[in-house]
Amino acid sequence: MLIVQQFQKRSFIIPSLISSGLSYLSKDIRLADKMEDGELHFPKTEFEKSQNTSRPLFQRPEPNYPGHVPLYNFEKLLMFLGSSIGAFVNPTNNNFIVSLGESTAFPWVLNRLRTQMLNDPSGRQILKERPHMTSKSLNLDELKNYPDNSLGKSYFLWLEREGVSPDTRVPVKYITDPELAFVFQRYRECHDFYHTITGLPIVREGEIALKLFEFMNLGIPMTGLGALFAPIPIKSSQRRRLLSVYYPWAVKNGTICKPLINVYWEKIMKKDIDVLRSELGIEKPPDMRELRKKARSKKKQVA
Amino acid sequence: MFQVIRRFATSVSNVADIVIIGGGPAGLTLGTALKNSPVTKHLKIHLVEGGKIIEPLNSFLETPPPNYLNRVVSLTPSTIGFLDSIGAWSHFNQERTQSYDDIVTYDGVSGARMNFEHPDIATMVETTNIQAGLLSRLNELNSQQEVKLVIQEDTKVTSIAKDSITQWPTLKLSNGDSLTCRLLVGCDGYNSPVRHFAGIESRGWSYNRWGVVATFKFADTEFRFPTGWQRFLPTGPLALLPLPNGYTSMVWSTTPELAEMLLSLDETEFLSMVNAGTRLSTEELSMIYDLAKSKSPDLLEQIQWRLNLFAGKLKPADEENFPLQVSEIVTGSRARFPLKLSHADTYVEDRVALVGDAAHTTHPLAGQGLNMGQEDVKSLVGALERATSRGLDIGNSLALEPYFSERWPQNHVLLGVMDKIHKIYSTDFAPLVAARSFGVDVLNSLGPIKDFMVGRISGNSKR
């Protein structure tokens, strides 16, 4: 009881001492601030006082390219934590995948990709021209008139079959270096061409298989995380099919095929897709939609 | 009988106290310093040089060439102090020298940088200017003295042997003369014949690197105080050192195949390549090297593209972290030389002493090679002065040993430090880059330690 009383007494005395001491010092502190700002001898005019020149408490650095949002490292870490949990729980939400991709696109990873591009003539051309893929730049309407089995036609057919458009790609926001941001943007925009050339559908299973293929070929961390964790929550029959058919294919083909980031897709639309595949060194995997259909009908028969 | 007399006569007329082999900066400084010293000026000294030097060196002072020569060295304050003390510095063509206060080194992989500041931390001088100034001072000394130093130019040493009676070194010269001396000093460079004669082993290794040199003019875009720049690329450092009027002398140490590539470029390509070398990342450089090696026609365009990207990213405040771009090359100033480390087991034998490159060669990354030779000369002259004033035979090991025991350990430490710096920087292995960058950042913020280092490289704290 005694201690409490004493404590209470002190808790009254000490703060009052501190505050009185501060109020005694504060005059000096304010005076020093004034001297430092030069206001003591050159007081502010009324006009200067009316201008609000004080800086805001928090200000982001200048963006390095249009649309850039400079992040501090701790923000990137938070973004990584949030988006990785989100992507695991709800992988169909594109926002999570996009943020996971950017928060793990470390400079050294993108730097390695850029080095690959610099050392390849067409990769260099891509870096120099910085093309952006949109339905307009790709001339989608013309593509359907391209010869059968050309890359352009196959791409068009694939877009139709899966019901997607090249305009849905989100622009890169959080990568610091403009050129590295372009490299990541390029990966994102070319993703549909990887679907086209492998024939993998955009269903969850197909995306997972393609992620491992991309990781083996490009080494982007997000794709590796996807290939590692995404198969955990899916159906066991699908996982079995992935592990027995598509993962071995992805490991083999992703490793031996030429770096896909160096392919200037827009310039080779007329090329025969089989010829292109053999040039790049990719074997087409078994059609996933077919396999799924077969498995489903088998299941029905058994039932 | 006649033969005996004749032989006697020849040997008498051609006996010298000291014969210096080599008319480079080391040999000329030694001759000048000995003639300048009141104790040793009476000695009979011959300087034998294989090439023609007197006429070219005199004409360098009388009618200086319009362009800077490509053999340029940086002199430390200590070296300049010594040259001044023997009265030679005022004979140099001062307009062609450039002193500077600031050296900036930066890591080609991580960008970690270090600033060395000290008034007149170094002075850039053409080696021909050094030789010409020394020769001019030597002529002045000769005109004041009875015993003159004899320069035998355009004369090669065909053989060195020991005299059968006196055991003194006897030289056979290409003009048919023979020359016997009490002390033979080898200032005759890396492949020193004198060292071979004395049977002194020189140990070391080739760096498997070449130094590519050239003289440039900086682009006239903004005012800069003269500054020494050095960028450590994994293939070797690229240094741009200031000359007067915005000119700059480059030494780019690099692998033999890249050196060959650099020499095979045309001059505009070479200019762009040097600008790329001072700024672009190692990945970009390796792409550019590959393009250059394959003689790609769009090399210039690709370099310009990367340089423009670099300039676009650079914030105005960071511009002074890099040297200005070079915009002109002095035609025909490109050359290369091999880099190696070597150190002789000893500098002195009975009646033989080695000075400068004959005794040691080093990597040019801190511009210490010639300065070490000047320190050698200073020390050797001191030893000879002491020996003379004590009445010792100047060719005797007792007279020469102090020179060796003073200089060898100091040179050995410097050679070792240069070697380690070269090795630490010749990798782009990430953990090592991180470690060396951390070290540089720490050192750069520790004033006293940096001052000590500046003292060492500028030769101020030695005594």
Curated annotation (Swiss-Prot), chain A:
The record's annotation in InterPro entries points to: Coq4, Coq4_euk
Record key words, sorted: Lyase, Membrane, Metal-binding, Mitochondrion, Mitochondrion inner membrane, Ubiquinone biosynthesis, Zinc
- Keyword match Zinc-finger: no
Reactions catalysed according to its record: a 4-hydroxy-3-methoxy-5-(all-trans-polyprenyl)benzoate + H(+) = a 2-methoxy-6-(all-trans-polyprenyl)phenol + CO2
User: Which cofactors are required for activity?
Assistant: Zn(2+)
| Compartments where found | Mitochondrion inner membrane
* Enzyme class name: lyase
Q: What is its EC number?
A: 4.1.1.130
Q: What is its main location?
A: mitochondrion
Q: Name one GO cellular component term.
A: extrinsic component of mitochondrial inner membrane
Q: Does the keyword Lyase apply?
A: yes
In which residues is Zn(2+) bound?
A: H191, D192, H195, E207
Q: In which pathway does it act?
A: Cofactor biosynthesis; ubiquinone biosynthesis
User: How does the protein's chain sit in the membrane according to the entry?
Assistant: Peripheral membrane protein
**One annotated GO biological process:** ubiquinone biosynthetic process
The UniProt entry's sequence similarity note says: Belongs to the COQ4 family.
| Subunit record text | Component of a multi-subunit COQ enzyme complex, composed of at least COQ3, COQ4, COQ5, COQ6, COQ7 and COQ9.
Function (record text): Lyase that catalyzes the C1-decarboxylation of 4-hydroxy-3-methoxy-5-(all-trans-polyprenyl)benzoic acid into 2-methoxy-6-(all-trans-polyprenyl)phenol during ubiquinone biosynthesis.
Q: What else is known?
A: This protein may be expected to contain an N-terminal transit peptide but none has been predicted.
What this protein is called in its record is: Ubiquinone biosynthesis protein COQ4, mitochondrial
Specify the taxonomic lineage: Eukaryota, Fungi, Dikarya, Ascomycota, Saccharomycotina
Name of the gene: COQ4
